Amino acid sequence: MHSPFLGPASLRPLADALAERGQQTVILDLRPSVVAPPVHQTLVGSFADVTADAALSGPLLLIGHSGAGPLLPAFADTFEEGAAGLIFLDAGLPTPGRSWRDTVPADLYSHLRLVSRDGQLPRWQQWFTPDPLVELVADEQLRAEIADEAPEVPLAFLKEARPDVEWDGPAGYVQLSESYVDDAAAAEALGWPVRRLDAHHLATATDPKPVANAIVELLTEMFTPPASVL
């Protein structure tokens, strides 16, 4: 599951790398669900509709990158038989009933409110100067694909309470960047298996093979045999 602030291009190379390792993968495009409030309700409903239409079978494990992490329990809750497990990929952990605004420094929300226009956030790469994509993604074509896919999300989304859904099943964590040191530590404190890579937040797109290896290692630790990956 890609971040609500990005699109499938941020994960497509990782999906390909996982497929090379024998993991069946599906990437959903969640962008149409994040352009108008209430975003959480629309996101979860759209996820349920798309996965039902896809007629997916077998044990399913959800991987959430970045801002998709806190939503994984709600996505998993839409499956009639539940999800086999969750993997948080350089992502925030679930905070049921709390908003994005509740979990970040006040000055970050204030900055985003200042750069928003007509109630809409700019694309993710325009939140700050300089453009983080220039530093993180050297390949111009890939950088353009990621930039073009980034949606303009309503500022109100940041204040919406996240779905009040808990998760007590198998879970794991892959840390890619320093921004998620605390989340990885919290996951470890919960007893989850954790893998830490010397990478960056968009290594899912720029250097996917080590990320795929880390995920497969987690699957091996969490399941025998591994579940299919969604």
Where are these regions (language model features)?
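Glycine-rich His-Gly loop
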Residues: M1-F5, H65-S66, A91, L176
